[in-house]
Amino acid sequence: MQSGIFCADIGTSSLKAAFVTEEGTVLKFMRLPFPHPVRAVDWVQAFFASWRTLPADYAVEAVCISGNGPSIVAVPQTYRAPGVSTNAAGSLSAAVPSAGGINRADLINGIIEAAKHDTLFLWNEPMPQGITVSAIPAGASLFLPRIAAFHAKYPDIFANAARLFSGPEYLSYLLTGAAVTSLPDPRYEAAYWRQEDLTRVAETFLHIDACRLTGLLPPFVTAGTVIGSFCGIPVIAGVPDFIAALIGTGTLTAGTACDRAGSSEGLNVCIPQPCRAEKTLLLPSVIPDLWNLSSVIPSSGAAFSAFLVSHGFLGNDYIAAMERITEEPFVASGAYPETFAGQGRAFVEGLAFRIRRGCDALEQTSGFRPVYTLSGGQAHNTLWCQMKADITGRTFALPYFADGELIGDAALALYGLGNDKGRGENLALIAQRLIRIKRYYEPDAALAHRYTEKFLSHSETA
């Protein structure tokens, strides 16, 4: 019998899931793409499709879900959560009966059927015509502008809604029947909603009673809390994918850092005191009294995919493309040739210089010179990771499992289970125990020197 945590992360285009042991070994990993356009039920079907792939001898000790935000899911007033099992059994046999004599397969099918009536409004869906974020009196909230946009786009659905959930809380609700909003830290309340912001948006923008809007939004609970159970398996309040990745890369003590790179890229460093700099973003850490300073490189991976497509490659053929690009000789000054390899070399050098500027900004502000733990799809490209190290002059650490969100989910679940599974450790120590480094990408001294000279010459002429 293998024991572990079932972790799931709701992405924009796919759901990733993993079964992670208490020692950080990933025994199973799944990635299920969503259809386009994606619906709420597609999230649910992908979650249970990944669940069903687990062998019968895998004992799930807890479930923890992270996801993108601020996506909104409306559950209608006519919805009734299926009876959730209180069985103590942790194995995955569908034949194990739930409370009331309903077996697990029937329970799952009932949840999927109910989800067909729920409405998803993704975080990146365009605002309805005539509405701008700046026009919504939402303060610092990331969610209230999306709720206002949802109200404008789907007024009838909004009027009939019983609850509005973000992604992780929605799936957790379907599993447990517990309607909650998971708060990473009390300092994040303003980024979700404060009562004064709710009242102002309800009365001056939505033109509804403030109590109506307040009633739609589930109450806050602390991330890492056991909010209920699914067939006797504890379900832990998860966090947004950004926070999960910080946990799963160990960016939880002052001076630790990560490079989370997929379709876009975010450099992060944990700092002891709040400090700001131009072109950086300051947010609370999930660890009390600590902070996270970020530098974001928008669409880094997406732009590279578009570049590949424009040159006849598949948009995800990164490794083959990098093999050709790295064969192009380095040019210290002047233009690269008008070939795929030449223009590709120019593209990735330019991208790495942007990353270097981001590292510079974080380090000058924080006073740390950290090793950056890698997370995300770009971490799997060896040639790119080494080139990034050479061009930026930084060291990058590659974990054995580079999907930091899922390791973060596992750490949060073990923390939520308490002393029995968390071994009495705090969240930072649990995460450190789960993260195992496979290799380090360190800058080659000679290459780093010539890239530094080129970078400085570009900076002087910029």
Language-model segments: residues:
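Glycine/Thr-rich phosphate-binding loops that ligate phosphate moieties of nucleotide
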Residues: 1-32, 65-133, 156, 269-280, ...
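Short coil/turn connectors at secondary-structure junctions
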Residues: 2-3, 117-118, 159-162, 214-217, ...
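Short glycine-aspartate micro-motif
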Residues: 3-9, 60-66, 164, 234-248, ...
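Gly/Ser/Thr-rich active-site cleft segment
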Residues: 12, 135-242
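N-terminal phosphate-binding loop and adjacent alpha-helix
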Residues: 26-58, 133-137
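Phosphate/pyrophosphate-binding loops at sites that engage ATP/ADP/AMP, CoA/4′-phosphopantetheine
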Residues: 47-62, 153-158, 202-211, 358-370
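Short beta-strand-loop/turn "lid" adjacent to the catalytic site in phosphate-handling enzymes
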Residues: 55-123, 139, 163, 168, ...
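Alpha-helix C-terminal capping segments
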Residues: 248-254, 414-417
